[in-house]
């Protein structure tokens, strides 16, 4: 199969908002595969989901700059592209950077313009084509003639959409039924929907709910079985060797085999959580500040799989063998006022907020459903647009990703805090494209620089330390609320205001 076929499908998926049309486009490509060719099926499934099979390639922004002119005709095969990235990922030692750059240049020289744009996006992890794993799973179900939930459950248990797609196309329902929970093999974690109101979250369920403190750490999934302890991140990366203190905690728990879901974070001397970056930095290595685990769910316990058991029963099992000091703080209540007070206490303690959970719900891994609802405070700032990037896929022809800056009275200029393409309707995209063309002062490839005059109200979940931006901080999960035509750049929020939020 040609890479051009994958790129064309990705482009078609990105060009529509219809979920049905997206699934149909992906299914059309999957039908062209030989189900017996598991290797090619796996690569195509990964590419349709917007990722490479290689977790790390060593490629960054510099590696993708100054690339050769595109080829005039499509000739790259999917299997060859995967093989090239496998070779690049294996490079190490003295001179590897040069060999990596040469290999990438050779690959890109054989790619057309559309293929180069797609390759840049997938390497950088910024491929905005709308083909999320859930769509690929549904497309595989349609091609294989099996229920969508069967593919989704197999993906959950395997910890891999790619494996589930290969199984569905090759063996249908029979092969999908062979997937099960195995202690020691990470599975996809359950995700939460979002709201800004604790009362609204509680009112969405009948009867009492579990209200968990939302800790600002890294998600961990802990497996203990005959082969020992294994710790995986939300993305299923094995970090066991980096968290020896967590391994010791798990070894002391009074059970033979189990799978726990939780968070790990670094605390300061007073017991308050340190900044997320401190936890992220510590969990990237095997030494440093102690990492403390907090567990909020159990998926398997001594031979019994608990995925399909109601949360209230899973919590009872969790409380039965995990001491309170290692459990996420929790309140069970049907009273919105009590839940709101618990959330206020969590925020006062330096935590992110709370997660409200349906006590009757099973563990629906890998899906952001309504059984769990996270509630976090939302901050807004009035910032100035410094530049904007040309859109791709469905946003081709528009100016999309805006670069955001805070006012710096000390210099009279602006300090960049991040960028976002979130929160934009088609009307917003059309308006901002016209507006920023009016303000344009230059253009370098995909980035259009503009006069710093347009104020935009931006919502975000918090701030994080950053060495990328001169202010030392960056916005977390920023999205556009509205453009403030009633404000001038001189009225935008200052860097001092932003830094005060970080303290």
Curated annotation (Swiss-Prot):
Superkingdom: Bacteria
Active site: 214 (n6-amp-lysine intermediate)
EC top class named in words: ligase
Name listed for the protein in its UniProt record: Probable DNA ligase
Binding site for ATP: 212, 219, 234, 263, 296, 368, 374
GO molecular function: ATP binding; DNA binding; DNA ligase (ATP) activity; metal ion binding
Keyword field: ATP-binding, Cell cycle, Cell division, DNA damage, DNA recombination, DNA repair, DNA replication, Ligase, Magnesium, Metal-binding, Nucleotide-binding
Cofactors demanded by this protein: Mg(2+)
PANTHER family named in the record: DNA LIGASE 1/3 FAMILY MEMBER, DNA LIGASE-RELATED
Protein role: DNA ligase that seals nicks in double-stranded DNA during DNA replication, DNA recombination and DNA repair.
Family from the record: Belongs to the ATP-dependent DNA ligase family.
GO biological process terms held by the UniProt record: cell division; DNA recombination; DNA repair; DNA replication
A family per Pfam: DNA_ligase_A_M
Reactions mediated catalytically: ATP + (deoxyribonucleotide)n-3'-hydroxyl + 5'-phospho-(deoxyribonucleotide)m = (deoxyribonucleotide)n+m + AMP + diphosphate
EC identifiers of the protein: 6.5.1.1
């Amino acid at each position: 199969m040609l890479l051009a076929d994958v790129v064309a499908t990705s482009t078609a998926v990105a060009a529509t908002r219809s979920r049905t049309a997206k699934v149909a486009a992906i299914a059309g490509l999957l039908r062209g595969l030989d189900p017996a060719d598991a290797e090619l099926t796996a690569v195509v499934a990964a590419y349709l989901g917007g990722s490479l099979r290689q977790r790390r390639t060593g490629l960054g922004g510099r590696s993708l700059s100054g690339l050769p002119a595109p080829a005039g005709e499509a000739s790259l095969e999917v299997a060859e592209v995967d093989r090239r990235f496998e070779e690049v990922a294996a490079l190490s030692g003295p001179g590897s950077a040069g060999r990596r750059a040469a290999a990438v240049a050779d690959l890109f020289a054989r790619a057309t313009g559309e293929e180069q744009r797609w390759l840049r996006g997938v390497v950088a992890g910024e491929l905005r084509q709308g083909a999320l794993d859930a769509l690929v799973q549904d497309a595989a179900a349609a091609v294989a003639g099996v229920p969508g939930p069967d593919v989704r459950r197999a993906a959950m248990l395997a910890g891999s959409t790619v494996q589930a797609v290969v199984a569905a196309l090759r063996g249908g329902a029979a092969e999908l039924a062979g997937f099960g929970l195995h202690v020691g093999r990470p599975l996809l974690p359950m995700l939460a929907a979002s709201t800004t109101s604790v009362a609204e979250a509680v009112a969405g369920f009948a009867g009492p709910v579990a209200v968990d403190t939302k800790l600002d750490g890294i998600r961990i999934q802990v497996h203990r079985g005959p082969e020992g302890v294994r710790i995986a991140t939300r993305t299923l990366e094995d970090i066991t060797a980096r968290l020896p203190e967590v391994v010791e905690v798990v070894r002391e728990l009074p059970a033979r085999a189990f799978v726990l879901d939780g968070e790990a974070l670094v605390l300061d001397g007073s017991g308050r959580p340190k900044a997320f970056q401190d936890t992220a930095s510590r969990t990237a290595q095997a030494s440093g500040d102690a990492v403390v685990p907090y567990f909020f769910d159990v998926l398997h316990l001594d031979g019994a799989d608990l995925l399909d058991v109601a949360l209230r029963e899973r919590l009872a099992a969790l409380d039965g063998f995990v001491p309170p000091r290692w459990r996420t703080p929790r309140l069970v209540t049907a009273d919105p006022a009590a839940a709101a007070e618990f959330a206020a206490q969590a925020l006062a303690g330096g935590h992110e907020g709370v997660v409200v959970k349906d006590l009757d719900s099973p563990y629906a891994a890998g899906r952001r459903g309504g059984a769990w609802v996270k509630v976090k405070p939302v901050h807004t700032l009035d910032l100035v647009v410094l530049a904007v990037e040309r859109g791709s896929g469905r946003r081709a022809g528009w100016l999309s990703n805006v670069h955001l800056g805070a006012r710096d009275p000390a210099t009279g200029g602006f300090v960049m805090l991040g960028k976002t393409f979130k929160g934009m309707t088609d009307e917003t995209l059309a308006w901002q494209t016209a507006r920023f063309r009016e303000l344009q002062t230059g253009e370098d490839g995909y980035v259009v620089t503009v006069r710093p005059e347009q104020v935009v109200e931006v919502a975000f979940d918090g701030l994080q330390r950053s060495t990328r931006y001169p202010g030392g901080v960056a916005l977390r999960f920023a999205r556009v609320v509205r453009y403030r035509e009633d404000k001038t750049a001189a009225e935008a929020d200052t860097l001092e205001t932003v830094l005060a939020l970080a303290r």
